[in-house]
Amino acid sequence: MNQKYSVTVPELGITFSTGSIAQLANGAVNVQVGETNVFVTACVAQTTKPGQDWFPLTVDYREKYAAAGRFPGGYFKREGRPSEKEILTSRLCDRPCRPLFPEGFLNEVQIIGQLFSADLVNESDISMVNGASAALAISDIPWNGPIAAVRVAEIEGKFVANPTIDQMFASSLDLIYVGNEKDMLMIEGSADQIPEERFIEALAFGHESIQPILKAIKELVAQCGKPKGTFPLVGATPEARTIIERVVPTERLIEAIFGKEKAVRANAVKLLKEEAKAALTAELGEGKFTDVDLNVVFEDLQYKAYRKTVLERGVRADGRGQKDIRPLQAQVGVLPRVHGSAMFQRGDTQNIALTTLGPTKDAQDLDALTGGVKSKSFLLHYNFPPFSVGETGRFTGPGRREIGHGALAERSLVPVLPPEDVFPYSIRVVSEIMASNGSTSMASICGGCLSLMDAGVPIIAPVAGISCGLMTQNASDGSIEKWVTITDILGEEDHFGDMDFKLAGTSKGITGFQLDLKINGLPFEIAKTAIMQARDARMEILKVMLGSLPAPRADLSKYAPRIQTIQIDPEKIGLLIGPGGKTIRRITETTGAQIDIAEDDSGKVFVYSNNAEAMNRAIQEIDSLCGGGGPGGSKGPAIEVGKIYTGRVTGVKEFGCFVECTPGNEGLCHVSELADFRVRRTEDVVKMGDSITVKCIGIDERSGKVRLSRKAAMKELEAQKQSSEAAPAQ
């Protein structure tokens, strides 16, 4: 897209251009990476609405099907409601831009980003953030930017800035870093249990990587930037502020909000607000002040009161210290019939999580215009009904906030899920928020993890989440001179504080994270403190969680579908499917079992049913049609309990190894069954391709999983040897 002005970031292959397209917008910039183009505009309303006391910033990102050379699906053949990816990208852009608008600036601002071309190599979300920054920076809209964004991957132990979509499949880290020249402004992403120290190194790498982008945006501003406009700032009148501060001094407000339950605190503040309104009416007269006067001053007073108790007294509104966690409760199996369920509660925040297992065909298809993953077999849906905060309201589909919170919890749990070849199920977790007073997304992670364990999903390690907040005091030059990080923030501490830093992970490292700020940047020193503080809190929460269920259940719920894997000749896949799917449909309809065929043409067939007879009939039909087959996917004889086998190690995992005992038929030898001493790492005993001797110690009746033991086999063989040596010679 050729335009009048352009700058390039050669280190990252990014080009910003402007000046010829959408010239009536306050700011308009095209961002090109490879052949992926995102066009971003920024516009501002010239007036505010009467009585408005909040900042209406709207960010909308849309992907055009034409960008990928495709027609939209459906009857109308045009783009419709925003997809989940579009919503998440919009939120990704909104969060770092919002805190940089001037206090009291309440004119509506709208940022629109459109994907105009997609090369299926480079993702578009980072371009959206950088484009919004550039559009705001060159516009006349008052804004304390620019900012810049970069994605950081870790591939084979090395950090990579702005990796391609294909490179991300090999990465153990997905970090989106947004910052300015000095500080970080927003981060989000996921990781494969990255240690905190390594995570901090990744943040430093991200900060270094954005500097060329910031330099380029400033060059663009120098070429064509508009002078910043003058807009009236909304605030309380001096007369109203003086009256309210006299009637409700900070100490009275501290007394109202200190050391009480949420409902009591809210009622006490409400009474003080009514008292202040009565004083305004008495001294200024009816109609001589507005709700804006009252609301703005009361927000300021509460802002001062909450941080005064923390910064000066070291005690928070509910009486806790800086690092104290609210009382924790965890229960599993709270509901019958469901495949897995759990209740997790932290203080007033409470969630119920439900897990459902299904066949792989229940995976969600993704219409990925920019490329990447085409489906996902793990879903986490977050619901926030109005009763959770004691209010009435709409009870319909999920909003942007619910989609965002669900995505955070989902990506925090994905790194510990078993691979599909170990656990070939689609999994859906639903987090129902029953009561809310801060950090409901972190409660969703804790409850969701417990419900997975209750459902018998063999997760690699349990995951817990915690949120850290921040209270700051600025010097006269605007720099932070005093600060305190606080663990497990309340809803009020989130609202009146400066930071919401959500961190989730296992005992080994971080799996999910999200940082949101209300200040103009977070120094690295504070970020490091919060990260380590969150680690300590996470360990405490994990203890409580594991107290309710120490490990995933060995067996699935009796209501969950059973699964058997059958190996057929790949050349007979077409025979099993039949013309137009006729054969596989007939088997499904006559037996009642569900049948999935692996998409990799390996010949693996998955048979699902919660009825043993239906499953066996389906397996027999497939076996008679295609030959081979049998429980466990065997072409050889089925594994039998009590027998000893010498087989080949086909998979090495953190929790044990898989051994093929007969052709196409394998089982799991748990790490605890590898030797008669404690094995720290599976690789210390066996490696991929090794030949080992194991004994079948059990087969789960519902799931068909085969349990093997090297320890039991060695013990039995040693006993046989001693017995033969002790026998008298004939």
UniProtKB/Swiss-Prot annotation:
Localization in the cell: Cytoplasm
InterPro entries on file: ExoRNase_PH_dom1 (IPR001247), ExoRNase_PH_dom2 (IPR015847), ExoRNase_PH_dom2_sf (IPR036345), KH_dom (IPR004087), KH_dom_type_1 (IPR004088), KH_dom_type_1_sf (IPR036612), NA-bd_OB-fold (IPR012340), PNPase (IPR012162)
Database matches in SMART domains: KH, S1
Example of a GO biological process term: mRNA catabolic process
Main location: cytoplasm
Cofactors (names): Mg(2+)
Catalytic activity reported: RNA(n+1) + phosphate = RNA(n) + a ribonucleoside 5'-diphosphate
GO cellular component, one term: cytosol
Keyword Metal-binding: yes
Highest taxon of source: Bacteria
Function description: Involved in mRNA degradation. Catalyzes the phosphorolysis of single-stranded polyribonucleotides processively in the 3'- to 5'-direction.
Family, per entry: Belongs to the polyribonucleotide nucleotidyltransferase family.
Protein name: Polyribonucleotide nucleotidyltransferase
Organism: Opitutus terrae (strain DSM 11246 / JCM 15787 / PB90-1)
Gene label: pnp
